[in-house]
């Protein structure tokens, strides 16, 4: 083993290639000189502008066969002999046939991981190693980076200060901790097997992250409990930060002979399941937020994987998404319900966890033959109406009253006049969802990512940070922890490159909301047709198909066609043919009256809502200091009838909901009219 040192660069440990197919081409591109990076830099999505096509499973198989490399076809990875392991190391292990096949190659991305040496790299790195030529030059592949010295010291300091619950000197303190975390029925033996400790100073449970195959400590997760009016809320802190914390809690207890595993979203649930069923259990490091592809090799050995992630529809949707990564044919899902709560709650309620596991539904079926396969899904939506409506905005309550929420698999088209603040509004719109755990990918083709990030950081802090630079690091650290990613594209790009990047983001980062700003700037290089309208229709159709196939919400910003300044924009004002509005599930229009009357109000109009048909208009107020939109404080007035284009008064909504009307009747939120004057408000209001 040898070390590579660079001035002003972090220490990198590399492992020389061993075995029959050793390459000799120099270092991988990941070690090329470049600017020093921060310790916890959020990875930018790779730009696909370069002539590098995404690899397919067929291409990987053909490449391995062409170079005489044996491989085994797995569920989500291909297994091959590892060139990073000395043959004597393999002989020292148990002589199982699959033991030497410890190199896992992801079928979707081509990324590889050696389970024995922990060497990893991209598909291009692996190709360079196989095809390399040269005399005497040694090839190296980057090992998965361990924690830096500062992080390692902090991990050891906390771990050494933490003690097992049963060793607490005060029995009342131990009992209080058990009650606080719901562990009254979890035995000391279970806590001991999973090496769970308790940090008295922080009143937190401590869950360890051990290096696979050894007892080395790589990180920790601290779980604190805060009392709320509606129960206990758990607060998680990971060391290192969430983006690099890849701990499958319970992995050291898994043996090679295990063929079935139950996957949970919380460590507490894994404790309850293991104790009640005796089955192997694993807990995902970031719960229902994402399943990093780096963890897939550790799940390859299982023939059956049961997801029991939680008791709400969001957990159910996450389970279905994760099953697609792992091959749905081997996955089963525990449906949320009154008699099927979280595993820990089920244990505390005296329910039979093995019985609940037997009710798990297969994640894959060839076809729907009758209502029988759908009835439980329908019941779930009827029983959880608010959750079925999607994630609700915290900054735009009137948008919740109209759209009800942000749902996966939908296409939203957003338009507004030039200079009205479309990008500023849609950035806050997406940021609101991102702060609630909606993994978001931004494709900004008109303005740079630096400028966009500056706007979003200002909106996140709700203050101008240029006037408070001493607080920048604090807010930047909090902003960096958001599940937010940016495409590195700028200007005109082909739809194929953009879709490839979006699919990569969905697979690697579990992105469920993509923002494209905007369509006209992106489609400049589209050579599908000389007819610009036809090209736009094709692109809109591609985004529609992507949203449906990947269960990912796509928000598409489109400039309107040229209209007179004294006229309001309509759905027909969207540039191009009617295909954009036809394909869209939601159509949002930012109406800007200041272009006609001078400085004035802006309104957000929901002109299409496929979910339940409610449409309407509500006012916005722009705060220049925080770059945010908010509802004017004086808008707390009754709903008013407005006239349609024919001068007829729209009928009152039959739903009776404030701020909502069915598809054609629009409702405007405005001030109460004076009692001495008739109500003369119009839809432009």
Curated annotation (Swiss-Prot):
ATP binds at residues 416-423. Residues 454-482 form a coiled coil. GO terms for molecular function: 5'-3' DNA helicase activity; ATP binding; ATP hydrolysis activity; DNA helicase activity; identical protein binding; lipid binding; protease binding; single-stranded DNA binding. It comes from the Eukaryota. It is a peripheral membrane protein. Ubiquitous with the highest levels in the liver, heart and kidneys. The skeletal muscle, brain and testis showed lower but detectable expression. Expression is coregulated with MRPL43. Residues 122-373 are annotated as: Required for hexamers formation and DNA helicase activity. GO terms for biological process: DNA replication; mitochondrial DNA replication; mitochondrial transcription; protein hexamerization. Residues 641-685 are annotated as: Might negatively regulate ATPase activity. One of its GO terms (cellular component) is mitochondrial nucleoid. Residues 215-335 are annotated as: Primase-like domain. It is found in: Mitochondrion matrix, Mitochondrion nucleoid; Mitochondrion inner membrane. Residues 1-122 are annotated as: Contributes to single strand DNA binding activity. Residues 642-685 are annotated as: Disordered. Residues 385-636 form the SF4 helicase domain. It catalyses: ATP + H2O = ADP + phosphate + H(+); Couples ATP hydrolysis with the unwinding of duplex DNA at the replication fork by translocating in the 5'-3' direction. This creates two antiparallel DNA single strands (ssDNA). The leading ssDNA polymer is the template for DNA polymerase III holoenzyme which synthesizes a continuous strand. Residues 406-591 are annotated as: Maybe required for stable oligomeric structure. Its EC number is 5.6.2.3. InterPro entries: DNA_helicase_DnaB-like_C (IPR007694), P-loop_NTPase (IPR027417), TOPRIM_DnaG/twinkle (IPR034154), Twinkle-like (IPR027032). Mitochondrial helicase involved in mtDNA replication and repair. Might have a role in mtDNA repair. Has DNA strand separation activity needed to form a processive replication fork for leading strand synthesis which is catalyzed by the formation of a replisome complex with POLG and mtSDB. Preferentially unwinds DNA substrates with pre-existing 5'-and 3'- single-stranded tails but is also active on a 5'- flap substrate. Can dissociate the invading strand of immobile or mobile D-loop DNA structures irrespective of the single strand polarity of the third strand. Homohexamer (via C-terminus), which assembles in a ring-like structure. Homoheptamer, which assembles in a ring-like structure. Homooctamer, which assembles in a ring-like structure. Oligomers may sequentially eject two monomers (octamer>heptamer>hexamer) upon DNA binding. Oligomerization is Mg(2+), nucleotide and DNA-independent, however, Mg(2+) and nucleotide stabilize the homohexameric form. Interacts with POLG in vitro. Interacts with LONP1. This is Twinkle mtDNA helicase. It comes from Mus musculus (Mouse). The gene is Twnk.
């Amino acid at each position: 083993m040898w070390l590579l040192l660079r001035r002003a660069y972090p220490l990198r440990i590399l492992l020389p290639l061993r075995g029959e197919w050793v390459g000799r081409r120099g270092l991988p591109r990941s070690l090329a000189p470049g600017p020093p990076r921060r310790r916890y830099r959020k990875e930018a999505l790779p730009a696909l502008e370069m002539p590098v096509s995404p690899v397919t499973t067929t291409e990987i198989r053909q490449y391995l066969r062409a170079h005489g490399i044996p491989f085994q076809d797995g569920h989500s990875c291909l297994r091959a002999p590892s060139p990073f392991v000395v043959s004597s190391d393999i002989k020292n292990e148990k002589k199982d046939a699959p033991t030497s096949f410890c190199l896992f190659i992801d079928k979707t991305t081509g990324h590889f991981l050696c389970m024995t040496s922990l060497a990893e790299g991209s598909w291009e790195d692996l190709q360079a190693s196989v095809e390399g030529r040269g005399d005497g030059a040694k090839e190296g592949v980057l090992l998965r980076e361990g924690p830096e010295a500062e992080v390692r010291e902090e991990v050891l300091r906390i771990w050494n200060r933490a003690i097992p619950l049963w060793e607490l000197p005060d029995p009342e303190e131990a009992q209080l901790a058990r009650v606080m975390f719901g562990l009254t029925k979890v035995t000391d033996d279970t806590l001991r097997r999973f090496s769970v400790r308790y940090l008295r100073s922080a009143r937190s449970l401590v869950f360890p992250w051990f290096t696979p195959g050894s007892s080395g400590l790589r990180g920790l997760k601290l779980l604190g409990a805060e009392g709320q009016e509606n129960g206990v809320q758990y607060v998680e802190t990971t060391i290192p930060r969430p983006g690099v914390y890849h701990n499958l809690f319970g992995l050291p207890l898994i043996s090679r002979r295990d063929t079935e595993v139950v996957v949970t979203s919380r460590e507490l649930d894994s404790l309850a399941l293991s104790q009640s069923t005796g089955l192997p259990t694993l807990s995902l490091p970031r719960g229902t937020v994402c399943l990093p592809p780096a963890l897939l090799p550790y799940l390859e050995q299982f023939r059956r994987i049961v997801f029991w992630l939680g008791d709400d529809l969001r957990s159910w949707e996450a389970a279905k998404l994760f099953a697609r990564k792992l091959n749905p044919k081997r996955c089963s899902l525990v449906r949320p319900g009154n008699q099927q709560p979280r595993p820990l709650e089920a244990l505390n309620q005296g329910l039979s966890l093995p019985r609940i596991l037997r009710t798990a539904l297969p994640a894959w079926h060839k076809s729907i033959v009758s209502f029988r396969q759908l009835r439980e899904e329908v019941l779930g939506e009827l029983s959880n109406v608010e959750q079925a409506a999607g994630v609700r905005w915290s900054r735009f309550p009137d948008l919740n009253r109209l759209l009800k929420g942000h749902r996966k698999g939908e296409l939203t088209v957003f338009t507004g006049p030039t200079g009205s603040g479309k990008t500023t509004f849609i950035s806050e719109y997406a940021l609101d969802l991102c702060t609630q755990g909606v993994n978001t990918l931004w494709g900004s083709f008109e303005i740079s990512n630096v400028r966009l990030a500056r706007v979003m950081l200002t909106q996140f802090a709700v203050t101008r940070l240029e006037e408070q630079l001493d607080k920048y690091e604090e807010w930047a650290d909090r902003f960096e922890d958001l599940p937010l990613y940016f495409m590195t594209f700028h200007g005109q790009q082909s739809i194929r490159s953009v879709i490839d990047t979006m699919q990569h983001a969905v697979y690697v980062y579990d992105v469920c909301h993509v923002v494209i700003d905007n369509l006209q700037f992106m489609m400049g290089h589209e050579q599908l047709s000389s007819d610009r309208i036809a090209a736009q229709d094709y692109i809109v159709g591609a985004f529609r198909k992507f949203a449906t196939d990947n269960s990912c919400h796509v928000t598409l910003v489109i400039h309107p066609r040229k209209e007179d300044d004294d006229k309001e924009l309509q759905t027909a004002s969207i540039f191009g043919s009617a295909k954009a509005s036809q394909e869209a599930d939601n159509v949002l229009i930012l109406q800007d009256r200041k272009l006609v009357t001078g400085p004035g109000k802006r309104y957000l109009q929901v002109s299409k809502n496929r979910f339940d048909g409610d449409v309407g208009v509500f006012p916005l107020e722009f705060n220049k200091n925080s770059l945010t939109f908010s509802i004017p404080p004086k808008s707390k007035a009754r709903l008013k009838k407005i006239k349609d284009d024919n001068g007829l008064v729209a009928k009152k909504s039959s739903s009776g909901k404030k701020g909502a009307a069915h598809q054609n009747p629009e409702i405007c939120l405005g001030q109460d009219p004076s009692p001495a004057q008739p109500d003369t408000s119009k839809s432009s209001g």
